[in-house]
Amino acid sequence: MHRRNLLKASMALAAYTGLSASGLLAARAWAGAADGQAQAFDFEQLKAQAKQLAASQYVDTKQVLPPTLAKMTPQNFNAIQYDSKHSLWNELNGQLDVQFFHVGMGFKQPVRMHSVDPKTRQAREVHFRPPLFNYQNTSVDTAQLKGDLGFAGFKLFKAPELDKHDVVSFLGASYFRAVDATGQYGLSARGLAIDTYAKRREEFPDFTQFWFETPDKDSTRFVVYALLDSPSATGAYRFDIDCQAERVVMDVDAHINARTAIEQLGIAPMTSMFSCGTHERRMCDTIHPQIHDSDRLAMWRGNGEWICRPLNNPANLQFNAFADKDPKGFGLVQTDHEFASYQDTVDWYSRRPSLWVEPTTAWGEGSIDLLEIPTTGETLDNIVAFWTPKKPVAAGDSLNYGYKLYWSALPPVGTPLARVHATRSGMGGFVEGWAPGEHYPEVWARRFAVDFTGGGLDRLPAGTGIEPVVTASNGEVKDFNVLVLDEIKGYRITFDWFPTNDSVEPVELRLFIRTNDRTLSETWLYQYFPPAPDKRKYP
């Protein structure tokens, strides 16, 4: 499926026996859903299966849906309700439960689901059948639903809101999401990204099967395994998912096998949306001051440096690669959680979680890649970030990556130095306090204001000199100001960028603050797009 079509489908759903005594608890959970024959299962077996699959030719298993499902609207799709009496762990009466998504619209891949007894390691498949769903408020012709259509994905519920509000969702290709304490979904992760920014068209691998270990009754943690398949790669995944009170933490063990040479392999990919914000107003002609799921890419480099890269909604597609070795972490972050910053009572961007990746194995050399796609609104995700290994991936290669995913308001770690609080950009070339009614500046310039907070800035001795260190890949930066911001217990750095030629190529700006030889802050990176020369003027 084309990226835009896949994202449209996903965004439309944002609102959406013979066992030993030790296996009796799991058997009760099986009673309402799992109906297949018991078979042995473990992760080693799954890894071997994925590797063997990579040695064979890819077979596209997407199905032709009956017309009643293929032609349905997102509203009709969302109206199909899974019957909670048949949820995977219904009879467990515990802290967690799983329900399944119906196939339909663009979700044509039949995903196979299995229930696993963690003690006996016996797995039984849950087969699709119409009695698992409620079609009362839909126009679905159930007479057309013949055979085992499979499922489109699954969603996880947590007590005390079992069957009310899901906290984890796997749906479409290898996409998945989770919430934090607000219960609001936001950005998405993926199992794998292939050729997102490459010569050939992007490939979207599918999770084709899942195996769910039945958790203990009082546990808020469970394990699910997944088989991934695509024309270029296969994968065996183990997700240890911990649904904590304030966040969801996923411990991921990914074993990837290349069927073919892969130009760009994206590890721990995440997808978000940035339409406009405090520094980018081009698409913000609405009543909302800001519209975004994430406002920045945060990176904790292998050498210990912290980077803040504000996101853009560029006029043209932009790709940036940040080289690193054994990164300590990276993520797409939503730092501002104030309602006043968004004024949104429908999508609630003030409640969107951040997503942080923490490698748990040595990733070696590579780059954190950022793709920013032009978008005219908030209905399409336009931000993609992932890790790409430096070593080319050849057919037959097998790779293993371990990492944790933290779905929380803010990342679980942060720089001990001052951090970037906000970035603003606007008209430059004048002294602060100037009013447009007086006169316009004689020389065109672009002003940037970067606010820093934390890191002990509020405890610096009176009279401490704060030095902004700014570099630009093109043009000239000058007219620096250092302003105390008591409201955030920090400082605001302002400076103007002046063009020195007619180039409209992106300008890379870099800033941090120091006193004497001591670095005080993380590093701010920004990509600015100069207007055409004939636009560099005031009225």
From Swiss-Prot:
PROSITE patterns the UniProt entry points to: TAT (PS51318)
Record-level GO cellular component terms: outer membrane-bounded periplasmic space
Gene Ontology biological-process entries: beta-glucan biosynthetic process
Signal peptide: 1-31
Pfam families per the UniProt record, alphabetical: MdoG
Listed pathway(s): Glycan metabolism; osmoregulated periplasmic glucan (OPG) biosynthesis
A single GO molecular function term of this UniProt record: catalytic activity
Cellular localization per UniProt: Periplasm
Post-translational modification remark: Predicted to be exported by the Tat system. The position of the signal peptide cleavage has not been experimentally proven.
Keywords of the record: Periplasm, Signal
Keyword Signal recorded: yes
Predominant cellular place of this UniProt entry's protein: periplasm
Superkingdom of origin organism: Bacteria
Family: Belongs to the OpgD/OpgG family.
Function: Probably involved in the control of the structural glucose backbone of osmoregulated periplasmic glucans (OPGs).
Name of the molecule in the record: Glucans biosynthesis protein D
Gene name, Swiss-Prot/TrEMBL: opgD
